[in-house]
Amino acid sequence: KDYNVVLKYIRQEVDMNETFRCAVTDLVTTPVLTVNGWWFDGNPVAEIPEEVVICGLQEASVKYPDLFAKHYNHYAPVAHRDGLVALNTAFAQDGVFVYVPDDVVLERPLQIINLLRAKADLMGFQRNLIVLGKNARATVLVCDHTLSEHDFLINNTTEVYLGPNAHMEYYQVQNQHLRASQINSLFVSEHRNSTFESVAISI
């Protein structure tokens, strides 16, 4: 099957209130959007602690080069051990970057809403990097949705780093139509006394 691959950002008009409606009522989160694997440049300014960074992966590589280089592609397996991750590393241009520094608690869950919308069959690659410092805490809810009826083949990789005594809850909810196929690779590097809890649900 032939798929289109998007290797540059194509801006799409997205009204979060109209395009995406969460089925979970009374859910209070800090929401951010990606569209076809790219950070949505219309994301609202999040109400988060000043020290916390939530932005696109491409933006993080420019604004925070030292932090980015210290963690990016350090926890996923090397290419000869996992061809799908190697494919993601080669083609992924963007995604979500989260940094919670030492002793900081992200009070609201971060909701990453990954939307797929295209006018033709699409293959997408998204790379996410989440870094929690010492004693940091965060909850991340990832919601995957399709907005158009074309075929989608998605290859996503997420790397997570937890410093000493850090705690993270990670939830992934996949709510996509039957013509969407998704490969999610999640790799976690944990330090002493850290805790990582993960739940994945496909609807």
What do the PLM-derived regions correspond to, one by one?
Residues 1-39:
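Short, Gly/Pro- and small/polar-rich lid/capping loops
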Residues 27, 31-36, 40-203:
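Conserved beta-strand/loop scaffold segments within soluble protein domains that form the structured core
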